[in-house]
Design a protein with these regions (language model features):
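Short alpha-helical "patches" and their helix-cap loops
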Residues: 78-79, 236-247, 348-352, 556-557
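Long, well-ordered, tryptophan-enriched scaffold segments
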Residues: 137-142, 146, 246-257, 387
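Surface-exposed, active-site-proximal loop segments in enzymatic domains
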Residues: 72, 239, 452-454
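Solvent-exposed soluble domains appended to multi-pass membrane proteins
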Residues: 256-635
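Transmembrane and membrane-interface helices of multi-pass
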Residues: 1-236
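The feature marks either
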Residues: 123-126, 207, 211, 218-223, ...
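Generic structural signal of hydrophobic/aromatic residues within well-ordered alpha-helices
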Residues: 42-45, 65, 127-131, 226, ...
C-alpha cells in the first residue's frame, strides 16, 4: 500500500506544478480585484488539489484492488505490485499530458480543455501539424516530458526501495493488511465521489470567487475533459432543455415578427431595400480570430490594423457585432445561413448533412456563381460536403495550391490565397454572370507563420500575426482595385470569431465574440452603425442592400429594418446575452448563471436580465428544435 500511496502523492505534486505553470503563464488574466491577494489565489490551488485527487483516486482504485486481492490469497510474488505501478505510471502520464495540453488551450480559449477537442481528432495530419508547428506549444510539451520522466524515475526508485513483508499462510496474520486495504479502497471510492453531499463532485464546486481565471484554475483538466465527454453521451444532455419548444418558438416568432407556416415557422419574404443599384458582385472575407479589440477603432493602443481601421471608417460598419461562437465553423454557419451556434457543436459535420436556405442559395437563385476559397484541406470541418450541399458551386482549397506554398498544417498563407482567388476571379469580366466569392483566412491561428517578406512593427508574435493579416488584406484590395469587376463589387469583411485580447473581465471575455463587420461599397457613403448586429444578420442585411428579394427561414434580421434588443451568442459550454450595460452568462450543464452590469458582478433580480434570458433561451431552443425537426429550409 505504501508504494501505491507514494506514487499517488507524487502524481499530485506533478499536477500541482503544471497548475502553477498555467497560473504563471496566465497571470495577466487575473481580475484587478484578485491581483495581489495571495490568500484568494491560493484557494484555487487548494480546489485544484481536491479535483486532482478525484482523478488520482480513479487511477489508484484498480491497483488497490489488485494488491488487496493478492494479499487475500497470500500471493508471494512482486508481480502484482510491479503491474500496479506500471498501470499508475501509464494513467498518470495521460493525466499529465492533458494538463500540459490545457496550458496553451486555456491561454487561447480562456476555457479548460473539453470535449470540443474531439472535433479535431478526425483531422490527424492537420491537428498534428497545428500542435507541432506552433513554437509556443513547445514549452508545455517539454514540461510534460521532463515531469513525466522525473515521475517515472521517482516512482520506480520508490518501488525498488520497498521490501516485501514475509508471506504468511495464516489468515489471522494477514487480517490487519486486509483491513487496511479495505479502508484504503473505501477512502479511494470517497475520493472519486469527491464530496459527502447527495451529488458527487462537479465542475461547479471549483467556483469560489468572482474571478473566472481562479475559478477555472481549480478544475483538473482531465476531469473536465472526462466529464464533458461523458456529458455528450448522456441522453438528457444530448439536447438543450432551456424552455419548452413550443414556448420558445412562439417567443422567437414574436421577437422576429414572423408568422410562417407550421413546417417553416420563421419563414418570411425579405423585401429588398435596393440601396445599391445594379447587380453587384459580392466578396465575403472571414478574418480568422479577428477580435474587434485588435483595431484602434475599438480602443487598441498599438497600430496593428491600419488598413482595417481605414476601411472601417470608409464603409458601412457595425460597431457592436458579435460572432455566434468561438470557432470558425460557428462563424461560417451563422453568417452564411443565419442560424445561431449551439454551444460547442459543429453543425457542419456529420454524414447526414442538413440543407439550409442561406446567402449562397439566395444568390445562386439570383443568378450568381458561388465560389469558396480556403487555405487548408477542403475536408476540414466537413466544409467541402457541407458547402457544396448548401449553395456553393466551386471550392478552392489546399488541394488546388502548389505544395511548396503550404507552410503548416492549415495550408497556405493568407496573401497567397488572396492572390490565387484574384486569378480565379479574373474570368469574370463584369459582363457575364455576377459572382459571390467567400474567402476564409487562417494566419491569425496557431501555429503562427510570419512570412520572411513581411516586416512587423510589434514585438509579440500574437500581434505580429495580426499585423500580417491586415497587411495581406491591404494587398488583396490593392490588387482588386485594378480589376474590371472591382467598382461593381460589394465587399463584406467580418471576424469569424475573436480571441482573448487584454484582460479577462468576465467568465466569458467579450473579445472572444466581439468582431468587426464592414460592408464596403466602392464610392459608397461611409457610416458607422451602433445597434446590435450578429453574424446571422449579414445575410438579410446584405440581400436587402443588394435589392435581392428572397424567401427567408432563419434567425437573421435586416438591420436596416429591425433592431435587436440585445446581442446573444455562445462560447463552447456557455450561452450569453449582452446589452449596453448588462451581460448574462448561463452554463446549461451546471445551471450556473453569471450576471454583470457595467463590467462588475450584479444582482440577477434585475427584470431586464429576465428579459435577456428569455430572448436568449428562446432563440437557442428554437434553433435546436428546428434543426432536430429538419425545418431549416424555406417552403
Amino acid at each position: 500500500m505504501a508504494v501505491l500511496l507514494g506514487v499517488h502523492v507524487l502524481g499530485l505534486l506533478v499536477l500541482a506544478v503544471l497548475r502553477l505553470v498555467l497560473f504563471v503563464a496566465g497571470h495577466s488574466m487575473l481580475s484587478a480585484d484578485s491581483a495581489g491577494k495571495a490568500g484568494l489565489q491560493s484557494l484555487a490551488f487548494l480546489h485544484g488539489l481536491w479535483f486532482d485527487n478525484v482523478i488520482a483516486c480513479y487511477i489508484l482504485i484498480v491497483p488497490l484492488a489488485v494488491i488487496l486481492l493478492s494479499c487475500a490469497i497470500g500471493l508471494r510474488s512482486r508481480l502484482p505490485l510491479v503491474c500496479s505501478v506500471r498501470w499508475m505510471q501509464t494513467l498518470w502520464g495521460v493525466a499529465f499530458a492533458v494538463s500540459a495540453a490545457n496550458i496553451p488551450y486555456f491561454l487561447y480559449f480562456f476555457k479548460n480543455i473539453n470535449s470540443s477537442i474531439w472535433n479535431w481528432a478526425e483531422y490527424g495530419t492537420t491537428t498534428f501539424g497545428m500542435l507541432f508547428g506552433e513554437a509556443s506549444y513547445y514549452p508545455p510539451m517539454l514540461a510534460f516530458i521532463v515531469l513525466l520522466t522525473v515521475f517515472i524515475w521517482a516512482s520506480n526508485r520508490w518501488m525498488r526501495r520497498f521490501v516485501m513483508p514475509p508471506p504468511s499462510s495464516r489468515l489471522l496474520v494477514r487480517l490487519p493488511a486486509l483491513a487496511l486495504g479495505l479502508a484504503c479502497i473505501g477512502l479511494c471510492l470517497f475520493g472519486i465521489r469527491g464530496r459527502r453531499g447527495y451529488n458527487p463532485i462537479k465542475v461547479s464546486a471549483a467556483y469560489y470567487c468572482q474571478d473566472p481565471f481562479l475559478n477555472q484554475l481549480g478544475v483538473n483538466p482531465a476531469f473536465n475533459l472526462l466529464t464533458s465527454t461523458l456529458d455528450d453521451f448522456r441522453p438528457e444532455n444530448a439536447l438543450l432543455h432551456l424552455m419548452d419548444n413550443a414556448e420558445a418558438l412562439d417567443r422567437t416568432r414574436a421577437y422576429l415578427k414572423r408568422q410562417g407556416p407550421e413546417d417553416a415557422p420563421l419563414q418570411y419574404e425579405l423585401q429588398p431595400a435596393d440601396t445599391i443599384k445594379g447587380k453587384r458582385n459580392v466578396v465575403l472575407i472571414f478574418m480568422e480570430s479577428m477580435s474587434a479589440d485588435f483595431m484602434q477603432a475599438f480602443g487598441q493602443k498599438q497600430c496593428l490594423t491600419p488598413f482595417l481601421d481605414s476601411l472601417y471608417r470608409n464603409s458601412l460598419s457595425f460597431a457592436n457585432c458579435y460572432s455566434a461562437g468561438i470557432h470558425t465553423n460557428h462563424g461560417l454557419y451563422a453568417t452564411l445561413y443565419s442560424y445561431p451556434a449551439l454551444m460547442y457543436r459543429n453543425l457542419m459535420k456529420g454524414s447526414n448533412i442538413p440543407t439550409y436556405s442561406g446567402l449562397p442559395t439566395a444568390l445562386r437563385e439570383a443568378g450568381y456563381r458561388n465560389l469558396f476559397f480556403m487555405t487548408h484541406e477542403s475536408q476540414y470541418d466537413n466544409m467541402n460536403a457541407f458547402l457544396r450541399t448548401n449553395g456553393y458551386d466551386e471550392i478552392y482549397a489546399q488541394e488546388n495550391y502548389p505544395k511548396e506554398q503550404v507552410v503548416n498544417s492549415f495550408g497556405v498563407q493568407d496573401d497567397y490565397m488572396y492572390r490565387y482567388a484574384l486569378k480565379v476571379l479574373d474570368r469574370f469580366d463584369g459582363k457575364s454572370e455576377p459572382f459571390f466569392a467567400t474567402l476564409l483566412s487562417i494566419s491569425n491561428h496557431p501555429p503562427y507563420v510570419i512570412p520572411e517578406h513581411f516586416r512587423p512593427k510589434s514585438e509579440d508574435e500574437e500581434t505580429q500575426i495580426v499585423e500580417y493579416a491586415d497587411w495581406a488584406l491591404r494587398l488583396f484590395f490593392d490588387e482588386a482595385r485594378k480589376k474590371p469587376w472591382y467598382a461593381n463589387t460589394v465587399f463584406v469583411l467580418i471576424g469569424d470569431h475573436g480571441k482573448l485580447v487584454g484582460e479577462a473581465e468576465s467568465v466569458n471575455p467579450e473579445s472572444y465574440n466581439h468582431v468587426p463587420l464592414m460592408i464596403h461599397v466602392p464610392g459608397g457613403t461611409p457610416q458607422i452603425r451602433r445597434e446590435w448586429a450578429l453574424q446571422m444578420d449579414v445575410q438579410p442585411t446584405l440581400l436587402g442592400l443588394l435589392g435581392i428579394g428572397a424567401r427567408q427561414h432563419n434567425f437573421g434580421v435586416d438591420l436596416n429594418r429591425i433592431k435587436r434588443p440585445c446581442a446573444f451568442y455562445t462560447a463552447d459550454n456557455v450561452i450569453c446575452a449582452r446589452d449596453s450595460s448588462r451581460f448574462y452568462v448561463y452554463e446549461p450543464s451546471t445551471g450556473q448563471e453569471h450576471f454583470y452590469r457595467d463590467g462588475k458582478n450584479a444582482d440577477g433580480a434585475d427584470s431586464i436580465f429576465s428579459e435577456m434570458r428569455n430572448y436568449l433561451f428562446s432563440m437557442i431552443q428554437s434553433a435546436q428544435y428546428l434543426l432536430q425537426q429538419g425545418k431549416t429550409t424555406v417552403r
